[in-house]
Every structure is written in structure tokens, then in C-alpha cells.
UniProtKB/Swiss-Prot annotation:
Belongs to the chemokine-like receptor (CMKLR) family. The lineage of its organism: Eukaryota, Metazoa, Chordata, Craniata, Vertebrata. Its main location: membrane. Glycans are attached at N7, N188. It comes from Sus scrofa. The keyword Glycoprotein applies. The modification Phosphothreonine is found at T338. The modification Phosphoserine is found at S335, S345, S348, S354. Disulfide bonds join C108-C185. It is a multi-pass membrane protein. Gene3D superfamilies: Rhodopsin 7-helix transmembrane proteins. Residues 61-71, 131-152, 242-256, 305-363 are cytoplasmic. This is Chemerin-like receptor 1.
Length: 363
């Protein structure tokens, strides 16, 4: 994702999307500094929690647990989030240096590519996990006979390759240019030449460039948000219906977990994608909508990368009965269910569930 994309000017020289200098015409120097400090602090916290939490999940899933389908999902999700957070310091430095890019054009392309790739990988993995759990409930016998670690790894390979393909525009359009004495890393959809004394043409003044911007933006919205949300929602509501029909859910907790998963995913990514769609018609919107909204929306979206380990531990748990060690909770959250029920593989259907198998039926 474009972490610096909240930083553009909204005038005739407007660049390809939210890039470079934090809305100079919208912010006073003091306001701009406050926004930069806010982003540096928030991104730093997310980076620290993301590297620590996902690193712990990677270690546990790799060295402390038996390989199962669930651990394959969780390991890949943690790796994607970990890589996402490893490259956050570059963008933290970019904001701290008043949006002066000193890392070169190649790193401008690569860092943004990796961030977009992580967005797609995480979303696709969450979707596959939801579909996998839905199949385990609807077709338990088939799932037991065909659900294998090899198939899970194959699915992960497809996900990473597909994410690579969808993220490749960053390698093509990401560019650097000079503006107001600073070097900016931005999306040059028009592919116009840049120099120390010039700035790329606004994409709406270049039909081809604006068309490329529309394709990239709409593709990200459809493939990175809308379609996954619809699939995840359909899977979880199907699970709820099946459980209630078979009276397997004895409490309302499973339904709360499902609703929370959907709402969390939706709230994290909806503002980000909404603002990018609005950006296509930014001239009809007040500049403050983007200069203030995009930093907040971006922070919320990237926070998703550090939330998963926390949700593994606490989702569906009663904090008043917090007696189990953190390490044990992570292991339980990542473990393949081995209990006995009509739908044995369904008890751990969510990557965020961590309940005691002796006492509770996990989703």
C-alpha cells in the first residue's frame, strides 16, 4: 500500500495519487508537523508489535508445533505480515524526514511492491482460511479425506504468485522526482519523464495515465477488498446457519466471533479503499477529506498487520479468566483441532480462535 500517498497537493500540479508532500496547501507548517509526528508514532508502534507478534507466531508455527493445515495458513499469514512490518521503517523514515526520499528509485519501487503484495497476500489468505473452514463444516467427510498439508501449501503458492501479479504495477509506475527541493516517491501512472525541475503531468490531463490509475485503483478495490469481503461474509454466515441448524453452537460466543471477524476486516480496509475511489474524482471533494482522511485510513489499514497475533490470543477469550500463559494461548490458537465432534475440523475454523479444547467447542 502507498504509505506516503496521503501526501499530495490538490492543485493543477496534482500528482498521480496521494504522494509526496503532505498537502502543503491544506496544512500549516505546525499542522503538517503534527501529522508527521502522529504517523511516525503510530507506524512505529505498529512496526514494533507486528515484528514482535508475527515473529513469535513464525517461531512457534515453525519450531514448536506439528505441521498441520492450520499452521500452514497461520505461518504464511504471519510471514506476509512480518515482511510488511520489516519494511515499515523505510516509510517511517520517509515521514520523519519530511517526506524526502533518500533510498533511490529501485527501493521506491521494491518497497511499495512488497507492501502492496502483503496487502493482497494477507487478504487472500484470510479468504482461503474462511473458505477452508466453511468446507470443513459443510462437507466434513470430504474435508477429512482431501484436506492435506500438501494442498494447503499449493494454495499458498497460488496466493503468493497471484499477489505478485496484482502487485506488479508498483514495479512499473512507482517513480521518484524532485519537488520543492525534496525527492518524492510516487505513482507516475502517466510514465512521463521526471527531472529536478519538472513534475509529471496530472493523470487526468493524460487520458492513458488516468486510465491506468483507474484500472489499478478499481482492481485493488475489487480484488483486495470487495470480493474477499463478500466471500468471507458468505462463508461465515453459512457456518453460522449450519451450526444453528444442527444446534452445535451452545452459546452466542461463536456468533460474536464471526461478526467481530467480519467487522474488523471491513473497518480496517473500507476507509482506505473508499478514499482511493474518491481520489479518482478528487476535484469534486474538499482537499481536507484526503489530507486528513488518508493518514488516518492508512494507519487503520496497516494496523491490521499487527492485530492478528493479538487476536490469536484473545479472540473469544474471557479476560477475567486469563490464567493461561501467552505462549500456550498462541499454541492453542494455531493448533489443529484434535477433539471429537460431528465436525471435528471445524472447531478451529478461524485463525483468531483460541479456546480450551477440553471445555469449549472451538469454531
Amino acid at each position: 500500500m502507498d504509505f506516503e500517498d496521503y501526501n499530495s497537493t490538490y492543485e493543477d500540479s496534482y500528482t498521480d495519487d496521494f504522494d509526496t508532500i503532505v498537502a502543503l496547501e491544506e496544512f500549516s507548517p505546525l499542522e503538517g508537523r503534527v501529522v508527521r509526528i502522529f504517523l511516525v508514532v503510530v507506524y512505529s508502534i505498529i512496526c514494533f508489535l507486528g515484528i514482535l507478534g508475527n515473529g513469535l507466531v513464525i517461531v512457534i508455527a515453525t519450531f514448536k508445533m506439528k505441521k498441520t493445515v492450520n499452521t500452514v495458513w497461520f505461518l504464511n499469514l504471519a510471514v506476509a505480515d512480518f515482511l510488511f512490518n520489516v519494511f515499515l521503517p523505510i516509510h517511517i523514515a520517509y515521514a520523519a524526514m519530511d517526506y524526502h526520499w533518500v533510498f533511490g528509485t529501485a527501493m521506491c519501487k521494491i518497497s511499495n511492491f512488497l507492501l502492496i503484495h502483503n496487502m493482497y497476500t494477507s487478504v487472500f489468505l484470510l479468504t482461503v482460511i474462511s473458505f477452508d473452514r466453511c468446507i470443513s463444516v459443510l462437507l466434513p467427510v470430504w474435508s477429512q479425506n482431501h484436506r492435506s498439508i500438501r494442498l494447503a501449501y499449493m494454495a499458498c503458492v497460488v496466493i503468493w504468485v497471484l499477489a505478485f501479479f496484482l502487485s506488479s504495477p508498483s514495479l512499473v509506475f512507482r517513480d521518484t522526482a524532485h519537488l520543492h527541493g525534496k525527492i518524492s516517491c510516487f505513482n507516475n501512472f502517466s510514465l512521463s519523464a521526471t527531472s529536478s525541475s519538472s513534475w509529471p503531468t496530472h493523470p487526468q490531463m493524460d487520458t492513458v495515465g488516468f486510465g491506468r490509475q483507474m484500472v489499478v485503483t478499481i482492481t485493488r478495490f475489487l480484488c483486495g477488498f470487495l470480493v474477499p469481503v463478500l466471500i468471507i461474509s458468505a462463508c461465515y454466515f453459512t457456518i453460522v446457519y449450519k451450526l444453528r441448524r444442527n444446534r452445535l453452537a451452545k452459546t452466542k460466543k461463536p456468533f460474536k466471533i464471526i461478526v467481530t471477524i467480519i467487522i474488523t476486516f471491513f473497518l480496517c480496509w473500507c476507509p482506505y479503499h473508499t478514499l482511493y475511489l474518491l481520489e479518482l474524482h478528487h476535484r469534486a471533494m474538499p482537499g481536507s477529506v484526503f489530507s486528513l482522511g488518508v493518514p488516518l485510513a492508512t494507519a487503520i489499514a496497516i494496523a491490521n498487520s499487527c492485530m492478528n497475533p493479538i487476536l490469536y490470543v484473545f479472540m473469544g477469550q474471557d479476560f477475567k479468566k486469563f490464567k493461561v500463559a501467552l505462549f500456550s494461548r498462541l499454541v492453542n490458537a494455531l493448533s489443529e483441532d484434535t477433539g471429537h465432534s460431528s465436525y471435528p475440523s471445524h472447531r478451529s475454523f478461524t485463525k483468531m480462535s483460541s479456546m480450551n479444547e477440553r471445555e469449549t467447542s472451538m469454531l
